Amino acid sequence: MKQLESFEIPRTVIFGPGAISKIHQIVASQKASKILIITGRSVTLQYAKTIADMLTDRSVEVLRYDYIDIEKSGFDLVLGVGGGRPIDMAKVYSYVHKKPLVIVPTSASHDGIASPYVSYTLAQKMIKYGKIMASPIAIVADTSIILNAPSRLLKAGVGDLLGKIIAVRDWKLAHRLKGEEYSEYASHLSLTSYRIVVANAARIKNFVREEDVRVLVKALIGCGVAMGIAGSSRPCSGSEHLFAHAIEIRLEESGGDAIHGELVALGTIIMAYLHGINWRRVKKIAKLVGLPTTLREAGIDYDLAIEALVVAHTLRPDRYTILGDGLSKDAARRAIEATELA
């Protein structure tokens, strides 16, 4: 007999042009009087202030994610307004203080807009609090706002979605070889998100219409739900993400930066090759959308990419993938050269 299962997924999802106007309604449903809005810099900060102006009947504090004191209490509800970093920090605060979370994405560059989990690098920094897991009670995705995000970030959202084909294959592999628990339902949701964006890639690639953003947001939210059902990021994060994380860690140490979804797209091409599936098709879709399809286009040094492939498997030793016990440097070079990334 199987054990009991439980999972948390967003209770309310509101998306479309003007969705931001519904925030007061969501806040009222929570009977929250003291609200913390965690946001980013410049444009996202302005959106956060706009939301604060909608909540003048409440006590609202707006803070940038890099100014947050995680230990400070006294709020009834947390709003994460912005891109990846503000949203992730809002999840951390929500988890630590056990307060409800509302996510208001101003871009759609990755599936964190609906997932309970934070980025690998932030999770490591916040390890003293345990495994961060904060499923939002509501997601308010105003597509008229997201449409104004830099197109490079929206294309990165497609890159993150391309990785789902690898994540699910890695999960199946771990299930077959290591007996890891596997959810057909969560996998199906993740792959459906992948298929939606691939089927519409040619139509949405320039992100000039509201419906283009709508397709992307729906797919990303689907991935967030998949992770909630699985109880982990497994259906949406495999070896392609380990490669991306390995690069992100090295860049952070050296003061560099990269766009997550672009790295995931490159990782997906490499891992498709290792899995023996059609990596050329993945690369073709990435190119069609306007994602980097070489290391040079992504601004990634060749030696850094080799190092990332060699060490990627060590980042999550509990997560078996096609990388197995790791690639040798020669195998890493062959993979990069075979996929014409260099």
From Swiss-Prot:
Cellular component aspect of the GO annotation: cytoplasm
SUPFAM superfamilies listed in its UniProt record: Dehydroquinate synthase-like
Principal subcellular localization: cytoplasm
Annotated localization: Cytoplasm
Catalytic activity: sn-glycerol 1-phosphate + NAD(+) = dihydroxyacetone phosphate + NADH + H(+); sn-glycerol 1-phosphate + NADP(+) = dihydroxyacetone phosphate + NADPH + H(+)
UniProt cofactor(s): Zn(2+)
Binding site for Zn(2+): 160, 241, 260
Pathway: Membrane lipid metabolism; glycerophospholipid metabolism
Pfam families xrefs: Fe-ADH_2
Keyword field: Cytoplasm, Lipid biosynthesis, Lipid metabolism, Metal-binding, NAD, NADP, Oxidoreductase, Phospholipid biosynthesis, Phospholipid metabolism, Zinc
Cofactor remark from the record: Binds 1 zinc ion per subunit.
GO terms for MF: glycerol-1-phosphate dehydrogenase (NAD+) activity; glycerol-1-phosphate dehydrogenase (NADP+) activity; metal ion binding
Domain of life: Archaea
Residues reported in the UniProt entry to bind NAD(+): 84-88, 106-109, 115
Subunit composition and interactions: Homodimer.
Name this polypeptide is given: Glycerol-1-phosphate dehydrogenase [NAD(P)+]
